[in-house]
């Protein structure tokens, strides 16, 4: 049976255009850090490096699967965004971590083995920057943003209003974006992105 995150984790990935409070469990991920404008080539190269590892993990798992699931859908790309300076948003001054979550049933050993094999097979220096990590569980507010990335402030304003109305406190300046659409194949006004940040 194939594990489908869209169907089996609707609480996390079935977000609506109105804000909700969610409990995000501890997650295993592959990730790579970056800095600068997400429209630049370096960003897309880092995305490609991460996906090459994600699909290597998937193919290796299919060959050796013995549990309940014999395949899985690769999780969507995520971006954790921070501003370098506490000032107006300047894309060239952004810091980010690109993330692709890994299924719990694959395990750290399986992910790391696939990562090492990919480093040896593909002559991409950025693969040396890809790493395995664990993201602790957290309480978050999230919302589905439909439209261009540059229009996200409107959705963040809705989230901030929700936080205030429910007597919550935002605990980080940065935020997480989960990209449900392929930006190279989708019109800007139809892009679907889950916006998420931690609260208490």
Can you say where each PLM-predicted feature lies in the sequence?
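A solvent-exposed interaction/effector surface
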Residues: 1-200
């Amino acid at each position: 049976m194939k594990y489908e995150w869209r169907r089996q984790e609707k609480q996390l990935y079935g977000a609506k255009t109105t804000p909700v409070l969610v409990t995000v469990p501890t997650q295993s991920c592959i990730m790579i850090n970056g800095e600068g404008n997400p429209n630049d080539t370096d960003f897309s190269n880092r995305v490609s490096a991460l996906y090459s590892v994600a699909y290597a993990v998937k193919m290796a798992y299919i060959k050796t699967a013995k549990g309940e699931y014999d395949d899985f859908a690769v999780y969507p790309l995520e971006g954790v965004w921070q501003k370098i300076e506490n000032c107006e948003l300047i894309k060239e001054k952004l810091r980010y971590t690109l993330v692709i979550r890994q299924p719990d049933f694959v395990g750290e050993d399986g992910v790391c083995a696939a990562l090492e094999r990919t480093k040896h097979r593909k002559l991409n220096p950025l693969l040396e920057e890809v790493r395995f990590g664990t993201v602790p569980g957290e309480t978050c507010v999230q919302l589905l943003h439909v439209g261009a990335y540059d229009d996200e402030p409107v959705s963040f304003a809705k989230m901030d209003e929700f936080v205030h109305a429910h007597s919550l406190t935002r605990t980080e300046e940065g935020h997480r974006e989960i990209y449900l659409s392929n930006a190279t194949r989708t019109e800007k006004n139809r892009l679907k992105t889950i916006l998420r940040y931690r609260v208490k």
